[in-house]
UniProtKB/Swiss-Prot annotation:
Regulation: Inhibited by malonyl-CoA.
Domain notes from UniProt: A conformation change in the N-terminal region spanning the first 42 residues plays an important role in the regulation of enzyme activity by malonyl-CoA.
Protein name: Carnitine O-palmitoyltransferase 1, liver isoform
Gene Ontology CC: one annotated term: mitochondrial inner membrane
The encoding gene: Cpt1a
Residues with the 3'-nitrotyrosine modification: 282, 589
Positions bearing N-acetylalanine: 2
Species whose genome carries this gene: Mus musculus
Acyltransferase found in the keyword field: yes
Pathway(s) per entry: Lipid metabolism; fatty acid beta-oxidation
Residue positions, PTM Phosphoserine: 741, 747
Phosphothreonine: residues bearing it: 588, 604
Length: 773
């Protein structure tokens, strides 16, 4: 094969006349360029480390401070209050240094120390300022004078042109709430869900815990919070994600869909070429830390950026007791799956990223390849879809050496995984409901063997060139993947574009190395494990009842006329829909973020409250007047927003109780209260997909360029998982999941109730979809 010869830098043969040495200049050139690329990345990391290390100051400010100190010395002004003189005396006891040299060195040393002190003062001041969260609880649209002054001070101490990780050391630590406060909020959250006798029993357990065991566990948790960067995140990652022994497909991984109504080209290889290039451009901005940190409140309050570190070059590695996350600093290839074969594709040539047309060329070569899968190769990824222990044992037994290890390393150390899917998915006008549902299900689990579920992201390109992502959950949360996905869709359509015939712009390049097949030697025993895993995963996938639908009757624009939070509006609609569907209330999970704190991830908002229940019951009671319903709606919305703010500012319920439970396990003490709290099922699990880069899309000019967002599998066997994205002013997309095996749930039925609930609530305000009010 030609590519095999290109990979050899030199060859030699022994002849009677001596050694005949033949050099491959092209191979040597690529080796040289690869080395230069590696050193360039190291230099960029070193430079960024310095810039981030001195933030909120800048490296150039060191020169300003030092020059200022030395200049003041020449004017006989001592800014050091005698410290420079002390440094001067201790510099040279031998008398070999001239007086002028000692003065300059002393000035530089003092100036450097002063510069470091200024940096630390600014950083600490910024951390103190960012610890204030009173602005979040202010009335919407109103800002007090003190808050304006506080914002101005934050901007002063925030420096200029921050890089992706510039604010990390200035972010406050997640505070540990008081045990009594958490217990009190917990009891308030379950009050509407329990009968009187059950609530009294739980109250007794909670009060006993708050007085006796709770303070002891809290002491250890406080101790951890003093030395750990975040007292929750490492345990959350380990015990909620990595120690789970069940399948991560459906149960943990989630998916993202692309634009609903627009497909910019129908050439599969071309769409893959453009979007892979866009992903690589995004990866480059992350590697160079050029991505702007996300900031709230008019680009003032920074959020933690730590989760971007493992977006690429990352894979979850199975273990018998616990999994681990493997992240490599750099990866120069991707692995592509097509028709049962695995291909390794290099991403660089001549020291640069492959261009979109070159990537299209690579993808087309894979699509045109007629070779057959090796024994056991086609369904190999089913191991990543089923239980973790069989996969861990199989990996250790059959993939720890030889060609299997080399090929598995190529997959696990790839920048990301790509599937060129053989099916066609996406919105079809003749059958909109079934087509969108099929699209979502394909991204969630595919055929159970054509996604590498352990990779941080699996990028899927369907035969008709629709695209999507399946993401592993342990390394980061959905907003990180969402941010990438917004960039990819906008760059693909508005920046890169396509030629008139649907191909990527640019020319082919005959000199780039062709994709290479990964080689496997999978014995019969391993193939049996693969088939068993596939059977288990298929059973799980076939049980998923997934309904994804657009709601375009009204959107955020009309909801804002109600003077309420769009998220609170939708959450109350979900409560009303659930009651219509089930005839009862249930413990409800809404994901909130805690990225106002360093290494923060998520917190739970318990959306089913006494106030929301009162509103729902009023809506179901035909004797209740519209005025009464309206009043109860407002009260319920205010309560929900208050709970959301508490969760964002570190005063949530569930992460604190989870960590107390972990401490109790380490101490080998039993807590009936914690055990019961953590065993309560979330029969309605919800999450909003935030739109973070609104400047990338002009929905007034391009109304059809709306994203569908993404979704996840049901959390409880007899419950619903609901995800939604609010796009522009007039569009909301919902994803509802449940299990066919549950006689109580039906995702399509819940969807109908949700549509009706949205209409019922908007009617309270006398508004319709076409209202000019």
């Amino acid at each position: 094969m030609a590519e095999a010869h290109q990979a050899v830098a030199f060859q030699f043969t022994v002849t009677p006349d001596g050694i005949d040495l033949r050099l491959s200049h092209e191979a040597l050139k690529q080796i040289c360029l690869s080395g230069l690329h590696s050193w360039k990345k190291k230099f960029i990391r070193f430079k960024n480390g310095i810039i981030t290390g001195v933030f909120p100051a800048s490296p150039s400010s060191w020169l300003i401070v030092v020059v200022g100190v030395i200049s003041s010395m020449h004017t006989k002004v001592d800014p050091s209050l005698g410290m420079i003189a002390k440094i001067n005396r201790t510099l040279d006891t031998t008398g070999r240094m001239s007086s002028q040299t000692k003065n300059i060195v002393s000035g530089v040393l003092f100036g450097t120390g002063l510069w470091v002190a200024i940096i630390m003062t600014m950083r600490y001041s910024l951390k103190v300022l960012l610890s204030y969260h009173g602005w979040m609880f202010a009335e919407h649209g109103k800002m007090s004078r003190s808050t304006r002054i506080w914002m101005a001070m934050v901007k002063v101490f925030s420096g200029r042109k921050p890089m992706l990780y510039s604010f990390q050391t200035s972010l406050p630590r997640l505070p540990v709430p008081a045990v009594k406060d958490t217990v009190s909020r917990y009891l308030e959250s379950v009050r509407p869900l329990m009968k009187e006798g059950d609530f009294q029993r739980m109250t007794a357990l909670a009060q006993d815990f708050a007085v006796n065991l709770g303070p002891k566990l809290q002491w250890y948790l406080k101790l951890k919070s003093w030395w750990a960067t975040n007292y929750v995140s490492d345990w959350w990652e380990e015990y909620i994600y990595l120690r789970g022994r069940g399948p991560i497909m459906v149960n943990s991984n989630y998916y993202a869909m692309e634009m609903l109504y627009i497909t910019p080209t129908h050439i599969q290889a071309a769409r893959a070429g453009n979007t892979i290039h866009a992903i690589l451009l995004y990866r480059r901005t992350v590697d160079r830390e050029e991505l702007k940190p996300i900031r709230l409140l008019g680009s003032t309050i920074p959020l933690c950026s730590a989760q971007w570190e493992r977006l690429f070059n990352t894979s979850r590695i199975p273990g018998e007791e616990t999994d681990t996350i493997q992240h490599v600093k750099d990866s120069r290839h991707i692995v592509v799956y097509h028709r049962g074969r695995y291909f390794k594709v290099w991403l660089y040539h001549d020291g640069r990223l492959l261009r979109p047309r070159e990537l299209e060329q690579q993808m087309q070569q894979i699509l045109d390849d007629t070779s057959e899968p090796q024994p056991g190769e086609a369904k190999l990824a089913a191991l990543t879809a089923a239980d973790r222990v069989p996969w861990a044992k199989c990996r250790q037994t059959y993939f720890a050496r030889g060609k299997n290890k080399q090929s598995l390393d190529a997959v696990e150390k790839a920048a990301f995984f790509v599937t060129l899917d053989e099916s066609e998915q996406g919105y079809r006008e003749e059958d909109p409901e079934a087509s969108i549902d099929s699209y979502a299900k394909s991204l969630l689990h595919g055929r159970c063997f054509d996604r590498w579920f352990d990779k941080s992201i699996t990028f899927v390109v369907f035969k008709n060139s629709k695209i999507g992502i399946n993401a592993e959950h342990s390394w980061a949360d959905a907003p990180i993947v969402g941010h990438l996905w917004e960039y990819v869709m906008a760059t693909d359509v508005f920046q890169l574009g396509y030629s008139e015939d649907g191909h990527c712009k640019g020319d082919k390049n005959p000199n780039i190395p062709k994709p290479t097949r990964l080689q496997w030697d999978i014995p019969g025993e391993c193939q049996e494990v693969i088939e068993t895993s596939l059977s288990s995963a298929s059973f799980l996938a076939n049980d998923v009842d997934l309904h994804s639908f657009p709601f375009d009757t009204f959107g955020k624009g009309l909801i804002k006329k109600c003077r309420t939070s769009p998220d609170a509006f939708i959450q109350l609609a979900l409560q009303l829909a659930h009651y219509k569907d089930m005839g009862k209330f249930c413990l409800t999970y809404e994901a909130s973020m805690t990225r106002l704190f360093r290494e923060g991830r998520t917190e739970t908002v318990r959306s089913c409250t006494t106030e929301s229940c009162n509103f729902v019951l009023a809506m179901m009671d035909p004797t209740t007047t519209a005025e009464q319903r309206f009043k109860l709606f407002k009260i319920a919305c205010e309560k929900h927003q208050h709970l959301y703010r508490l969760a964002m500012t570190g005063a949530g319920i569930d992460r604190h109780l989870f960590c107390l439970y972990v401490v109790s396990k380490y101490l080998a003490v039993d807590s009936p209260f914690l055990k019961e709290v953590l065993s309560e099922p979330w029969r309605l699990s919800t999450s909003q997909t935030p739109q973070q880069q609104v400047e990338l899309f002009d929905f007034e000019k391009y109304p059809d360029y709306v994203s569908c967002g993404g979704g996840f599998g049901p959390v409880a066997d007899d419950g619903y998982g609901v995800s939604y994205i609010i796009v522009g002013e007039n569009f909301i997309h919902f994803h509802i999941s449940s299990k066919f095996s549950s006689p109580e749930t039906d995702s399509h039925r819940f969807g109908k109730h949700l549509r009706q609930a949205m209409m019922d609530i908007i009617t309270l305000f006398g508004l319709t979809a076409n209202s000019k009010k």
